[in-house]
Regions:
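Active-site glycine/GP-rich loop and adjacent strand/helix microenvironment
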Residues: 10-215
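Conserved short alpha-helical elements in the N-terminal third of ANL/AMP-binding
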Residues: 2-11
Length: 215
């Protein structure tokens, strides 16, 4: 992000965040401390916005909601929000677009990690009902949605399965790595000619409680 901003003649401002610390606090039921930490992080962002020209924001859903309660993002100059780092249900995406961003600020859900890179989402259409679909950056990364009990089987379109990642770069090859995520297999959609994944969430989210922390 910083490199891209610099190439385009802009600056990039970072707020340090320790999600593992927050997850530990929540697991230990120290909710008041976790809340204080989130407020501390959001306050730093709110301090930067009035004094710098910032139009693009990269953040997580919970932090975006907290920041939106503190400042008017449009008036602060934000024109596009890239949001990821955790699962986002369709109703959460709808709330962000219609309430937080007031249908005026561009919203771009993202999914990814260090091994895959960034899987971009396609523009939401009315028929999507606010369900985001992501496409891996092929050919360096390929996603497959597999039967978690028989991982050599690919599930059908519209079905839930576990995310399988294959990464191939000049320096690194990692075939068929099972991610800690589950998702719906989605069909190809312009401008992408390969399968996508939708409604990504932690693997086993319906069977057990999973702490995602401030993410």
């Amino acid at each position: 992000i910083e490199h891209l901003a610099n190439v385009r003649g802009s600056s990039c401002y970072f707020i340090d965040l320790d999600p593992r610390f927050v997850k530990k606090l929540i697991s230990n039921k120290q909710f008041d401390v976790a809340k204080q930490y989130m407020v501390h992080v959001v306050d730093q962002a709110a301090t930067i916005l009035p004094h710098r020209k910032v139009s693009g924001l990269f953040t997580t859903p919970k932090l975006l909601e907290a920041l939106g309660e503190k400042v008017n993002l449009w008036d602060a100059g934000i024109r596009g929000v890239f949001c990821g780092g955790t699962s986002m249900k369709p109703q959460e995406i709808r709330f962000i677009i219609e309430e937080l961003l007031e249908n005026r600020i561009g919203f771009y859900p993202t999914y990814g990690n260090t091994l895959m890179g960034l899987a971009a989402s396609v523009e939401l259409q009315p028929e999507d009902n606010f369900s985001a679909t992501y496409f891996a950056p092929q050919p360096r990364a390929v996603l497959r949605v597999v039967n978690p009990k028989q991982t050599d089987e690919t599930v059908g379109y519209g079905e839930w399965g576990r995310v399988e990642l294959t990464t191939l770069t000049k320096e690194f090859f990692m075939p068929r790595f099972l991610e800690r995520d589950e998702t719906i297999r989605r069909a190809a959609r312009p401008p992408y000619a390969w399968d996508g994944v939708g409604d990504v969430r932690p693997f086993g989210a319906l069977e057990k409680t999973i702490v995602e922390g401030v993410y």
